[in-house]
Amino acid sequence: MFKFKQVIVVRKDLKLSKGKLAVQVAHGAVTAAFKAYKEKREWFEKWFHEGQKKVVVKVESLDELFKLKAEAEKLNLPTALIQDAGLTEIPPGTITVLAIGPGPSEIIDKVTGHLKLL
């Protein structure tokens, strides 16, 4: 069983293409992992050596994303909000995903455990 994980939360209201969605999720995963590497090195290393578990879940709105970010930050979890450059499908600066962690699974579950998988 994994003791550490990373969760990437996707906005479904944007109706992104599969390719665009995959890229946004990747941006979130890398950005949050880099932040954890700098700020929560022990969590990052344990997550990395366990196999780098990632889970992708969905929300229906930007407001939900902001609420989750605030909850995660209260628990001192690394987070990353991703804004699109706006070169293809959506306007510049559109927030597409929130990545949380890597961090202890039981802490991240307090924030995202109720969300449905993408």
Curated annotation (Swiss-Prot):
Pfam families to which the protein is assigned, alphabetical: PTH2
Disulfide bonds: none
Catalytic activity annotation: an N-acyl-L-alpha-aminoacyl-tRNA + H2O = an N-acyl-L-amino acid + a tRNA + H(+)
Keywords, in A-Z order: Cytoplasm, Hydrolase
Cited SUPFAM superfamilies: Peptidyl-tRNA hydrolase II
UniProt subcellular location: Cytoplasm
GO CC terms of this entry: cytosol
Listed CDD domains: PTH2
Record keyword Plastid present: no
Coiled-coil zones: none
InterPro entries assigned: Pep_tRNA_hydro_II_dom_sf, Pept_tRNA_hydro_arch, PTH2
Example GO BP: translation
Enzyme Commission number(s) of this protein: 3.1.1.29
GO molecular function, one term: peptidyl-tRNA hydrolase activity
TM annotation in the entry: none
Task performed by this protein: The natural substrate for this enzyme may be peptidyl-tRNAs which drop off the ribosome during protein synthesis.
HAMAP family attached to this UniProt entry: Pept_tRNA_hydro_arch
Family membership: Belongs to the PTH2 family.
Designated name of the protein: Peptidyl-tRNA hydrolase
Natural source organism: Pyrococcus abyssi (strain GE5 / Orsay)
Taxonomic classification: Archaea, Methanobacteriati, Methanobacteriota, Thermococci, Thermococcales
